[in-house]
Amino acid sequence: MAKDLLPKQAANEPSLKDCTCKRCLKLGASKEKKIRRKKKGEEKRERHYGNRRKLTFNFLKHTNMENTNYDVITSVGYLNEKYGLKKSHYIEKFIKCIHRKINIDVSKITDAYVNSLNPWVKVKLFLLLVTLSEKGGPEYWLDKTDGEKNSEASSTDNSLENSTKGADSAGSTALRDEMVKSHKNLFPTLTEQIIQHNINQDFTESTYDEDYVFSSIWANFMEGLINHYLEKVIVPYSEMKVCQQLYKPMMKIISLYNEYNELMVKSEKNGFLPSLQDSENVQGDKGEKESKDDAVSQERLERAQKLLWQAREDIPKTISKELTLLSEMYSTLSADEQDYELDEFVCCAEEYIELEYLPALVDVLFANCGTNNFWKIMLVLEPFFYYIEDVGGDDDEDEDNVDNSEGDEESLLSRNVEGDDNVVERHFKPDPRVITLEKICEVAARQKWI
């Protein structure tokens, strides 16, 4: 009944597409524009997310944060109120960067892989977390001194009781101590294995105290998180900023070089700038042509051709110098911009990371200890524990190899100056100017400046 009461469109009434009045044309055009905009947005989203793997893990959603203050200290309101807008801006970017790292990498690790882990790998990961929870050692050592006093008092009581025993027991004790020491040398503890393999090859518990382990793990882990932020946020932002400054100078150099090439091609096509072979033939027939052509105009033409040949040799050199200067400016500006951004970040966020973020992160990890997500997160965070120090001697050997390779390259080049066929290509070194141009063009394409 309700449908029957609605007014029906007359059969001869024109539709929106058929009507040619201004109102209908305007409505039709706006409708088509909306459809095109919607299709364009869908295509853009497909290009942006089509090849990206869907994340199956979210740190804030899939971890147990009960009895922790992690969600509080990472909230925007808390950060703005305690640290202000400027500092909280850097802190929020850091937290998002770490969450993104964890979410992406944990999503790549399957439960089957976690279940197949060697138990000793899990013991190592848990030991790293326990070591990190000591916060560098000072608080631990404050509690440790009282325990050492009690242990010393108990050891004195035991020594008084044991003093009544015979010489045989004393000899057996000394022998047992020697066996324990030799056993430790043959079979290092788990802590010794971790430190020797990842941080310090010469580490032993007899020469380094626990404070060294706690401080090394704490400093390495914090520095690892900061350096990850440097690589993923500061460096790309600094490169984009520098490329934005150098984009116009680069395009100006390229356009000048293209114009120069076009002029050279036109001059050769018009016959004004003959090739070297043609110019030699012209010189051979000079005596015959001088009698026919005007000598003055011929001299002017030859002078202009010489100037053009000279320009053909000098202009590329000038452009090459400009490209070298552009590359040097890129290197200098990038380094300065990265240092400035890193200093700003450290001044704004280092205190928060050390005093609030890391302790809260440790609490969250302990709250989820034993679950598959816990082992996945620890596998992702493990490289940060060994960020600063490498196993001794690797860097020195690499530097020696670089120096030797550079010396070999110079000797090979000096040997093959005259013989072009014998040039050794395996020592090819990319031109930094080309690398700079590629980097600027890559950033320009990504930012849609081109």
Curated annotation (Swiss-Prot):
Q: What ranges does the record list as Basic and acidic residues composition bias? A: 141-151, 283-298
Please provide the Gene Ontology terms (biological process) for this protein.
branched-chain amino acid metabolic process; response to xenobiotic stimulus
The residue ranges flagged as biased composition, category Acidic residues, are: 395-411
Q: Which domain of life is it from?
A: Eukaryota
Q: What is one GO cellular-component annotation here? A: cytoplasm
Q: Where is the composition biased (Polar residues)?
A: 152-171
According to the record, the residues making up region (Disordered) are: 141-171, 276-298, 395-416
Q: Which residues form a coiled coil?
A: none
- Any miscellaneous information on file? Present with 98 molecules/cell in log phase SD medium.
User: What protein am I looking at?
Assistant: Uncharacterized protein YKL075C
Q: What is the lineage of its organism?
A: Eukaryota, Fungi, Dikarya, Ascomycota, Saccharomycotina
